[in-house]
Amino acid sequence: MASRITFPAAFAQRNAVVPRIVLGTGALLTSMMLVGCMSVPVPDLPDRVPAVWSQTAAGQGVAVDARQWWKVLADARLNALVDEAVAGNLDLRQATLRLQAVRLLSGTSDARFRPEISASAKQVQDAAAVDTYFHAGVEAIWDLGLFGAAESARLGAQAANGNAEALRDAAQVAVIADVVRSYLDLSVAQAQVDLLGRQQAVDARGEQLGLVRQRLHLDEPGELDRLRARRAATRAAIAQANENAGNASRALALLLGRDGPDPAWNAYRTPPQLSAFTLQQVPADLLRHRPQILLAEADVLQAAAEKGSARASMFPKLSLGGSILYAYNLTQNARSNSDSSPSIGPYIDIPLWDWGQRRARYQSDDKQLDAALLGYRKAVLQGVAEVEGALGSLARQDSSIQSLQVADEAARQQVVRQARQVQLGLSSEFDGLETQRAALSAKADLIGAQGARVLAFASLYRAVGGAPLPAEPEGDAQ
């Protein structure tokens, strides 16, 4: 239901009561505007987190900058790959463009609450079909956006902008972590191929000596078959490691936005090593850096904006409007062939018949806001749990690496002793092959554990939300 109060110029001249009407209308509008200047309530976020981590990184070492955490690995080739991925990854570029698109629209979120002016010109005919008129007019209307309507629109634009920024940041965090993972998978797989190649040479020598032992009737029953089966298993392991390296190189090429792997990557056969480090971030830092939490915060803002808009729709909608109409009689069948009529006044749209529907929408949006708050709380708890899990994994990998380093050193010393015994004639070359194989296996286990530790490190800073500050394109709308 809408009403409009207009005051033609001729009417104002003939009626002395107009000032009282104007004063009364002004008082009514003033009171409505004062009541309508209510803010949109945004609830406090349930952002309670522990003061410190229950798990801590083992040892004290270099302080890690969360914005450049991968540089702790001190691998120049990895640094170059990360820089290339940040500049050329297709998912990240899509997220950046979507953010720019949202920012362009967010600057116009309050456009409908600004004065609008329109002009029109048309030809009309009177009801008797006698005279034809030319009408020209200018109309202006201003939706005041009372009762939180304008603020809800601005809050919604802020939520959309925050959502797009969090999605862009999430893409960047994921891309960097995936580049580190793919690079690590590639280098570990190719290092394993080298070790398996040496193991294959040992197996081949064992099969040769097994044939000699068989001719001399020195072999045990089924010895040669076991040697051949071992050599076949090594060939299968080499094929699997080569497949893993190929998969990692293709994944890395996709992350960089390349058509295919670079042949130079075949030289990546030394996995990066992680030295002792110190985690500087505390649980409260997750609230500012973890994209999933920022996404949940944007959802809360969006839900609050929708609730505020629903509440505003339950109140009268007040607009100020005015128009000037000029009419010219084209047929000149009237005594006066032209006239003008200015008018100004408020528009009041009062919800009557659909007020129940609007109230139901408000109640529904209130429930949606409660759900968004629960989602935010879950995002906070999930972030803390992921960081704690990554810290626990790092601690377990540290313990495992220490044990494997002892085993690797013991196996290496055993190879040295065995070679010495062969030189002294106290043992045979065939007996020393098993020792060499055990040493290669221990080395492979150590490389795998060191790679798993780097993966846990990458998972830690992925959970923290570690990524460089994104470069804002020049001229990007803020």
Language model features: what each stretch is:
Residues A2-F7, V22-A87, N242-R288, L330, ...:
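Terminal intrinsically disordered/low-complexity segments used for targeting and assembly
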Residues Q68, A76-R77, L81, R103, ...:
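Small/polar-residue-enriched beta-strand and adjacent coil segments characteristic
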Residues A150, A166-V282, S393, R417-R420, ...:
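Periplasmic alpha-helical coiled-coil/stalk elements that build and connect Gram-negative outer-membrane
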Residues Q214-D219, V422-L426, A463-A467:
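A short glycine-centered flexible hinge/capping loop motif at secondary-structure junctions
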Residues H217-E220, G383, A390, G425-E429:
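Alpha-helical heptad-repeat coiled-coil segments that mediate oligomerization/polymerization in large
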Residues G222, L426-G448:
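Short terminal targeting/anchoring segments
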